Amino acid sequence: MKQPSALSALVEALRVLPGVGPKSAQRMAYHLMQHDREGAERLGRSLLFATEHLQHCEKCNTFTEAQICEVCSDDERDPTLLCVVETPADQIMLEQTMTYRGLYFVLMGRLSPLDGIGPKEIHFDRLVRRASDGVVKEVVLATNFTNEGEATAHYLGQTLKARGLAVTRLARGVPVGGELEYVDAGTIARAMLDRRTM
């Protein structure tokens, strides 16, 4: 038996989400149609609203409903610090620490030549213009500690240092509450190398 075309279209639409394969998409579609049609309608309205109202901040490239986001509009922030992150989710995580009071630039990705993602796709030119505005003194590279994130940080760091900017990288190490017995050797090694005086 062939499933209705409307259901097939829903399954295919759900597959655009990261980590959602054909089986998961089919389960989600059937759940929404069988048990939560109201939720399905709310999901559809929310997706439509988001695509119509969200845009990229003109300064930092994060998602916003205005031309300039809330963080970039905040006069209390330190404009001499610019933290570079891969995604808006990374920015939110840093904000939740309440330890950073500078500004941001969101790359919306990371360098991955095998996937066709180069400097243009991560808005490299915009970042360089922003960092070279004469106000920024330090660029904090907060890309993830994956191979692509490290390559991105290296590429950005070399280019920004050549422009006379101070470039720093987030430290790596043992997580808060972590026990050495359960931490991988690479993390422990990095924590040992990045140790500081007390």
From Swiss-Prot:
Keyword DNA damage applies: yes
Gene name of this polypeptide: recR
Key words, A-Z: DNA damage, DNA recombination, DNA repair, Metal-binding, Zinc, Zinc-finger
PANTHER family found in the cross-reference section: RECOMBINATION PROTEIN RECR
Origin superkingdom: Bacteria
GO molecular function: DNA binding; zinc ion binding
Organism: Burkholderia ambifaria (strain MC40-6)
Presence of keyword Cell division: no
Domain Toprim per the UniProt entry, residue ranges: 80-175
Pfam families: RecR_C (PF21175), RecR_HhH (PF21176), RecR_ZnF (PF02132), Toprim_4 (PF13662)
Family assignment from sequence similarity: Belongs to the RecR family.
ZnF (C4-type) residues: 57-72
Classification via SMART domains: TOPRIM (SM00493)
GO biological process: DNA recombination; DNA repair
Function recorded in the entry: May play a role in DNA repair. It seems to be involved in an RecBC-independent recombinational process of DNA repair. It may act with RecF and RecO.
The name this protein goes by in its record: Recombination protein RecR
